[in-house]
Design a protein with these regions (language model features):
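N-terminal signal-anchor transmembrane alpha helix of single-pass membrane proteins
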Residues: 1-39
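Short alpha-helix boundary/capping motifs
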Residues: 3, 7, 53, 60, ...
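A short linear-motif detector with a strong N-terminal bias
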Residues: 21-23, 44-48, 111-113, 119-122
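Intrinsically disordered, low-complexity boundary segments flanking structured domains
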Residues: 27-32, 52-55, 120-121, 127-130
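Short extracytoplasmic
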Residues: 41-60
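Structured extramembrane domains adjacent to transmembrane segments
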Residues: 59-158
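Extended, compositionally biased alpha-helical segments that mediate assembly or anchoring
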Residues: 166-167
Length: 167
């Protein structure tokens, strides 16, 4: 009976240790986010609100990760006149000027045709796991599924292009 109790205690301790240990996915995400921080990203978990999609009564909210790059200093006049925008990957009626499969959350009909063409070129070049793109006077953001490091570098290039082009 004593051996049974000792075996039960040992098995329960091993089970508790295994339960607390991070999974392969957790280790991958920790390494990816450390690399993102090294590259200058701010990584934030937040709820992304989608526009109301075609055939759906209510807009959905998704918990996702935003990878952000700060714009740096821009002058006050440019900051005050900035046209913030956010697009998401979904089928919606608010899609004027965007590629198929993308819709506006903020900024529809506010940007020039030239800026829309630049945005569409960026959207076409993004990895499939990116579900949204955002631009404010403070930062540019990509919301994505954290698939692999190569995609993160591709996203960084796209966000740097957005900063350079003042999108």
């Amino acid at each position: 009976m004593n051996y049974f109790i000792i075996a039960f205690v040992v098995v329960s301790l091993v089970g508790s240790v295994m339960w607390v240990m991070p999974t392969k996915r957790d280790k991958f995400l920790a390494a990816l986010r450390m690399e993102a921080k090294r590259l200058g990203f701010q990584v934030q978990l937040l709820k992304l609100k989608f526009p109301r999609e075609k055939g759906v009564l209510e807009a959905r909210e998704v918990s996702t990760i935003a990878y952000r790059l700060l714009r740096g200093k821009i002058d006050q006049a440019q900051h005050n006149g900035w046209q913030s925008w956010r697009v998401v990957k979904c089928e919606t009626n608010a899609c004027e000027g965007l590629l198929n499969g993308w819709g506006w959350v903020v900024g529809e009909r506010e940007l020039s045709v030239d800026k829309l063409e630049q945005i569409n070129a960026l959207l076409a070049a993004l990895p499939d796991s990116v579900i949204a793109l955002e631009s404010t006077p403070v930062h540019v953001s990509a919301f994505w599924g954290e698939q692999d490091e190569q995609q993160m570098h591709q996203i960084k290039e796209s966000l740097n292009q957005m900063i350079t082009m003042s999108l």
